[in-house]
């Protein structure tokens, strides 16, 4: 199986967690795009979706799936999203696609988080993939200096503005052994909107597309 075929297998496997009559939380990225294709086969059985990005919203609407505003729902049964890295505790680095804040919000209102990845995303220690931090523009330099104090090497993601109008710092060179503690420390910095560590709200179920098929961890 190619990497894209493994992503597709994981995306379609997540369909079993979608219940008829529900509103589904939908994440962002190449693996999620396969899930959206799968979800379209159930579009007449579900009420619709809450999306974590403009890109996913556009794809959902193109396929005829109604998209609800996050503020108009009290909660979601399930949220399906990918990850840039995930460890054995189902803690993740997310935000390579710059949608981390909205992803974290949709995850927070969902009862169950289904993470879908190919097997290249599984790691023992988080941090080889640069850790994204969404920052209010005027705080960029200050936050970068503070991230250096925390042991990171931050780089401004030039030319990228988030759906919320903010900028991204990608933090290189970190071996994250205590993800919850680092999530707290970075989120406490003035000017940080959120960090792409999903440790306090990790995945409940992990579906991994692998050469031998889809593996499930929960």
UniProtKB/Swiss-Prot annotation:
GO cellular component assignments: cytosol
Keyword vocabulary terms for this entry: Isomerase
Top-level taxon in the UniProt lineage: Bacteria
Pathway assigned in UniProt: Carbohydrate degradation; pentose phosphate pathway; D-ribose 5-phosphate from D-ribulose 5-phosphate (non-oxidative stage): step 1/1
A biological process term (GO) from this entry: pentose-phosphate shunt, non-oxidative branch
Signal peptide boundaries: none
Residues that coordinate or bind substrate: 28-31, 81-84, 94-97, 121
Active-site annotation: 103 (proton acceptor)
Catalysed reaction, written as an equation: aldehydo-D-ribose 5-phosphate = D-ribulose 5-phosphate
Alphabetized GO MF terms: ribose-5-phosphate isomerase activity
Known EC number: 5.3.1.6
Enzyme class of the recorded protein, top EC level: isomerase
Protein family per UniProt: Belongs to the ribose 5-phosphate isomerase family.
Oligomeric and partner information: Homodimer.
Job of this protein: Catalyzes the reversible conversion of ribose-5-phosphate to ribulose 5-phosphate.
Name of the protein described by the UniProt record: Ribose-5-phosphate isomerase A
Species lineage: Bacteria, Pseudomonadati, Pseudomonadota, Gammaproteobacteria, Vibrionales
